[in-house]
Each structure stands twice: as structure tokens, then as C-alpha cells.
Amino acid sequence: MRTQSISSHNVQSSSFSANQHAAETSISAGGIISEIVYNADQPIVTHLLLPLLQQLGTQSRWLLWLSPQQKLSRPWVQQSGLPLDKMVQLHHINPLFTVDAMERALLTGNYSAVLCWLPHELTEEEKVRLRHAAQAGNTYGFIMRPESTGGDAYRLFPSLKIHSTLYH
């Protein structure tokens, strides 16, 4: 998996688990944006991201999934231990407006995390907008993007996949 934090913040050692520390860092740092590039052959991303989402699900705020053209599987959400009553999904949005929708959602501060699936890399201007929105809303933003098929010779890190069983 290749992740890229679009926000810089200091991480101090702690006796807390990594997920608890990450959730607390989000609160103290004012929110962050991270990009996860995934590949269809490696399904481990759910094992990495799910514990953090479970921890964030204990907050009083919502978890928002912006997944154009795909719908989350209700049985998967229940089986994963995520709070069904705190899940919001927008899947009938135009992929061209997904970044704008993510920015607006991050700014509201109503969400612990906003997950967004994008087919392309973000521009520098989009990264700045999302970083500022996440900080203003004190929210985690996760940008999920499939690995591009070209340029594999230059790939430095393996990527991960979100199982299609997440959707029905």
C-alpha cells in the first residue's frame, strides 16, 4: 500500500494503540487528509483502515462514504463492526464533483471520517483545499484511489485493494 499524508503533523510515542493515537492526533491536529492507492490484487487495506474506522465510529460524529457509482453492502458494514446508525453514504454523485462534495463534508465538522473514492490523482490545488477543509472541520479524510496501470516500472511501494465484497 502506498499512503501519502497530505497534511504534516507530529506523532509522539504513546502507550496507546496506533489507532487510538491516530484518532487523538486527528482531534489535536485539527484533521488530516491521507491518500491510499490500492491494487486489485492486494486486499489488505480493509485490515489497516477498518480498525481506525471502528475507533472513529465511537465518536458522536458520522462516518461518510463518498463512493460514486457503488453502494456499500449493509451486511458487510454490520459484520465489520462499524456503527450502522452512524454511517452515511453518497453513491449517486457525479465523479466530477466528488472532490467538491468531500471538501464541503470535511468543512462541516459533522463527520469523524470522510472516505472518498477517486479515479485520478488530485491536483495540488485540490490537496490544499481538502487539507484546509479537514483541519477546519477537525475531520479525517481518506482518498481511495486505484493504482494507475501505467508506470509500474516506477512504482516504489506495493498497493492494496478494498474487497469488492464491501459493495453489493
From Swiss-Prot:
Segments of this protein annotated with the region FtsZ binding: 105-111
Keyword set includes Transferase: no
Post-translational modification: Is rapidly cleaved and degraded by the Lon protease once DNA damage is repaired.
Segments traversing the membrane: none
Lon protease binding: annotated span: 161-168
Keywords attached to this entry: Cell cycle, Cell division, DNA damage, Septation, SOS response
Pfam families, alphabetized: SulA
Site (Essential for degradation by Lon protease): residue numbering on this chain: H168
Description of what induces expression: By DNA damage, as part of the SOS response.
Biological process terms in GO annotation: division septum assembly; DNA repair; negative regulation of cell division; SOS response
NCBIfam families, per database record: PRK10595.1, SOS_SulA_coli
Family to which the UniProt record says this protein belongs: Belongs to the SulA family.
Subunit structure: Interacts with FtsZ.
Function description: Component of the SOS system and an inhibitor of cell division. Accumulation of SulA causes rapid cessation of cell division and the appearance of long, non-septate filaments. In the presence of GTP, binds a polymerization-competent form of FtsZ in a 1:1 ratio, thus inhibiting FtsZ polymerization and therefore preventing it from participating in the assembly of the Z ring. This mechanism prevents the premature segregation of damaged DNA to daughter cells during cell division.
Protein name: Cell division inhibitor SulA
UniProt organism field: Pectobacterium carotovorum subsp. carotovorum (strain PC1)
